[in-house]
Amino acid sequence: NNPVPTRAEVSDVANAVLDGTDAVMLSAETAAGKYPLEVVREMVAICTAAETTEVVRLDNDFSGKVFARIDQTIAMGALFTAHHLGAKAIVALTESGSTALWMSRHLIHTPIYALTTKLSTQRKLALYRNVRPLLVDSSADRDEALAQAEAHLKKRGIVETGDVYAITCGEPMGTPGGTNMLKICRVS
């Protein structure tokens, strides 16, 4: 019944973000209180502030690590490359969402756009940290899918001419867990 969170509530939400939590939710009494919209806005502000204070340390995450899966290796390569290039976005064309999940486990300020043809995958991806899921039309042709992805990013104002982004996909297309390609693109 209070429009302003307590210091403890702010601390709990901020620490959850700093601990790498994918999602935060309201308790029943907060969600049903007198100020539900204000509470959500405040939580967004707290989460955003906590995320921007974090320092990206991908070198520490990857140093001495061996990845057993090809899709995981490609996901980590996309994160590392995008971070060091100052890429505007990372795009994962994904059936199951596993590539985006691998990426979301590491702190990076570059937004991750997970493009999927499956509504169930899009819904699951909505809970992953720093992942913005987009539903797209199905395409069996890799080049067509890559062009569609860039068109989606441009249409939404995510990238513009001259921006660099990283994109991952599998060849052949449509195989869950089959991500085996990383491409660095410059928007023309």
Question: Which residues does each PLM region occupy?
Answer:
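Active-site mouth loops of central-metabolism enzymes
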Residues: 1-8, 64, 68
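Glycine-rich phosphate-binding active-site loops on the catalytic face of alpha/beta enzymes
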Residues: 12-36
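Conserved, mostly hydrophobic/aromatic
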Residues: 16, 103, 165
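Flexible, glycine/charged-enriched surface loops at secondary-structure junctions
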Residues: 27-28, 33, 52-62, 88, ...
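C-terminal helical cap(s) of enzyme catalytic domains, especially alpha/beta-barrels
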Residues: 30-52, 181-184
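Long, charged amphipathic helices and adjacent flexible linkers at domain junctions
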Residues: 43-79
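C-terminal binding/interaction regions
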Residues: 160-168, 172-173, 179-185
